[in-house]
């Protein structure tokens, strides 16, 4: 059912799922752009547990869960010497020089970008054979990509590619989001009024649909990562230049928020928010 101007009070409480503690994102300024490939490598989460089950290669997300946590598994699933492109120049990494990389598992949230609502389900597509995980350094205008390919039923990391954000298919949206995520006044000016809203009843998980006035945005908005964000490309071509769907979720899948943006007359604006 539709509620106009005000969603029932219980919906407000449910937004807590989208609003955990505000986390401080690692400052990109402390990481030289050309050293990004080694900047996230630590052994904090690395383990030497037994080989994950074969089922871990079914979905990319299942594979990634183990890749980011298991040191032995990670090293086994990298094609060495690892191609490591930095602004087009290959600086290969030998197996002995590799440092365990937890990628985004240490983050309280990570983000994924799609060009429409339908493509959000691509993460569950078992036919996908090439996935690109990205770190997007908004403040420095840099992108680090991890290229994973599935060969003979197994996912492997084949290439790192660090380059200027200008080469990225989402460069226009990233430039917009850089300011949207940090400037409250800019946010308010780039939200359709009213905007669509959906949340779920915690008792029966029934959807609660409605619309909110832009003045209510500060009360409902999720904590949005800024400065440095992730993206996982499951094969999205981003051919729809007028729409982007940003999914903010936690590695544990304990929370998820979806923000839908549309571009009208060259200007991006938030049109819909969904909180799970």
Where are the regions that the model predicts?
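Short, well-ordered alpha-helical segments enriched in acidic and aromatic residues
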Residues: 62-69, 73-99, 187-201
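Surface-exposed, charged secondary-structure patches
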Residues: 83-87, 92-142, 201, 206-255
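Short beta-strand edge/turn micro-motifs at domain boundaries
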Residues: 138-167, 254-276
